[in-house]
Amino acid sequence: MELNRRQALGALAAAALLPTRAAFAQQRTLIVPTLGGVWEQFWRDKIAPEFTKLSGANVTLDVGNGRVFGANLRAAGPQKPPYSIVMTNEVFSEGLRKEGFFEQLDLAKLPNYNSTYQVARNTGGYGVVVCYSPVGIGYRTDMVQTPPKRWHDLWENPEFRNRIGLYNFANSAGKMELLLASRLFGKDQYDVDAGFKALADLGQVIQVDFNLSTALAAGEIVVAPFDFAEIARLKKQGLPVDYVVPEEGVMAFDQTLNILANGPEKELAYQYANFLLSPEAQELLMRGFYVSPTNTAVKAPEELAYEVPISGDRMSEILQWDWAFVNEHQNELSERWASTVG
């Protein structure tokens, strides 16, 4: 049976209203929480475009930090979260996980999980670390005669007295400083009485919530816990600084991925998570931020040996912490920090 002209035009119009598979994919949007500043720009320039090529989906960035993302999730509730995936420090992830926001990872949808180091999987199957920013000891080479070799030197080298910088307790690094001191001078990381006493024994310190670089550059401090990548950047700017990888192990900022149990784009979230764990994305992150990749297939090349000292077999030097313990005692520990450390 032949179509008349009106029927043919009607059929064409109806077909035009039906989205193609490619168009449908383009209509899907994944909201990705990310840090601001250089992280946001890197995500816009590198990560988001690469994921769009892979998935055909759009990416909308929601800029903030772990505290902001947690507040947004709690305001919406576990049943209607604004995100499908969250990447943040485990200290924030642990509390949200306990409140029922995240699901146990479906590893069938996350094949690159099997290529990660064991140190990246310490969340009981609920999350996975994409990368670490290891923290050792940074110092001024022109103001220190005896460079540190280990964390204990912060207490034992008289040159450092009243010239030490610390992150404050609001920062996850401040919490790690307490647990580290507890481990160094007490029975274990839970021996916070010993930890607080040790921190008090440091004497007067300069504390910051985020940036120790300004104080180090100005000579207000001569030594502090420092992200290796930050020391590498300061050194390239001509500042007389260096770092050491402490003998007792390193602290580290983690970027832990979590899938929302009731997220609006959960399948897309798994694609995105698997992409971030891929060798290609891990290479981008390592070269962009000097982070330690968690995919075992990606190791720091010789030209990045200084910028990324913790890689390959050295990933085992990253110290692990009980964030459930920290979160359970958050208020008490914060008050003790304020009265003991300042």
Where are these regions (language model features)?
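N-terminal secretory signal peptides and thylakoid transit peptides that target proteins
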Residues: 1-16
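Early extracytoplasmic/lumenal segment of secretory-pathway proteins
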Residues: 26-94
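Extracytoplasmic ligand-binding site segments that recognize negatively charged/polar headgroups
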Residues: 37-44, 82-220
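Short amphipathic alpha-helical coupling segments at ligand-binding clamshell hinges
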Residues: 43, 47, 150, 191-198, ...
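A ligand-binding cleft/hinge motif common to bilobed small-molecule-binding domains
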Residues: 93-95, 217, 222-240
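Periplasmic-binding protein-like
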Residues: 133, 196-200, 237-263
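Mature extracytoplasmic/periplasmic domains
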Residues: 260-318
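Extracellular/periplasmic bilobal clamshell ligand-binding domains
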Residues: 302-342
